[in-house]
């Protein structure tokens, strides 16, 4: 087994540092301007240099043409060549008899190379080249003579040198100006980013969620608006969290206080020398304690479900809503076997949170059963309304919900005056709303019998999905044994209608009729 190296030989992690965005923008501007300056300088230098050399070539050709066309080379070649000494060129005339006439500028000598010798020998008719800082033109004449003319490139080199100096200075100034301008632009452009940074640090340090002022409509302004949207969402989330904690504390305080009072009374009655409570009162206290514990358990469970949905991370899967309704009905019947359930469901698939959908349906059925009088009827319908939507309707024959309170029943911990005398946490319908909206659905509340006495309440839940057809793609049929033993399954999820559910000798009995 290979042992790890001793600690002294372990290499410490290298600290990687990066330039700030402002410096990167400034360096990018400098680099781009420098590249453009270099390219432009090279182009200008090449164009000017080519123009100067072309001008020298044109001057040499013009001087040679003038000497040849004037006839002075044939009449008096010596005088013609000497006349060039007063200009800025060097000249040489080589006759066939090898007589040579020359005229050079002071300190200059017309160089002879292989190209000029080839022209003199007649192998070449024309030669133009650069040698010894001179531009040399050699022309073979028709009479066998050869004319050589050269011009110094020193003045041209001086001009090009000054041009290079000017281009270097101008380019350097341009790069410096680009750096300064880039820094100013980066500073001005990144000012909103600085405000965002300060705001983020302020939020982390002080929990101050005030929005940032937005200026303009550019990308940084949109970034600021997005950050403000995040701040607003965070503010709403914290407000909901604070409201949930406050409401939960308020709702928990009442049963806890009552539970504490009853427990203290029971403990005091068991103390040595304390008067004994009648057995009936003891039984009542114990029943109250159990009821309060159940109420606390229900409240805590609802809170867990509520926070679970908000926290996210739930697993989405294909859910058979007919199966969900059947399982929820099975649980509700155990608690209320003195009411009838009128059920009519179709096979419908929803892609979503199976546990959340089951809890929402169970809460709707529990709410309907709670408000239904003994012998009442609860209607449960799941019907397809269009190719991609189905509607679940849960109706009861209870006292109904006033129209002014229908928006409030879905608020957390809201309980009407009539509901406060009944068990419940005030979170059931809030969970229903949260689950339905999370699945892209909609819900509303109406009277079961408008104008009736009592009017009853009907909850309408619209859920997106697809129909579940026997033998088609979708979830496999669930065996009928998993449901109410008295319920019979037809096909994958055939429509069924429960006619009556009555209590006989403490046991529930149901009769079903398949449609």
Curated annotation (Swiss-Prot):
E.C. number: 2.7.13.3, 3.1.3.-
MF annotations from Gene Ontology: ATP binding; phosphoprotein phosphatase activity; phosphorelay sensor kinase activity
Main location, first listed in the record: membrane
Top-level taxon: Bacteria
Keyword Cytoplasm: no
Keyword Aminoacyl-tRNA synthetase assigned: no
Post-translational modification: Autophosphorylated.
One Pfam family here: HAMP
Cited InterPro entries: 2C_sensor_his_kinase, HAMP_dom, HATPase_C_sf, His_kinase_dom, HisK_dim/P_dom, HisK_dim/P_sf, Sig_transdc_His_kin-like_C
Cell compartment(s), UniProt: Cell membrane
Required co-factors: Mg(2+); Mn(2+)
Membrane topology designation: Multi-pass membrane protein
HAMP domain residues: 187-239
Chain ranges on the Extracellular side, renumbered to this chain: 46-165
Record-given protein name: Signal transduction histidine-protein kinase/phosphatase MprB
The species this protein was found in: Mycobacterium sp. (strain KMS)
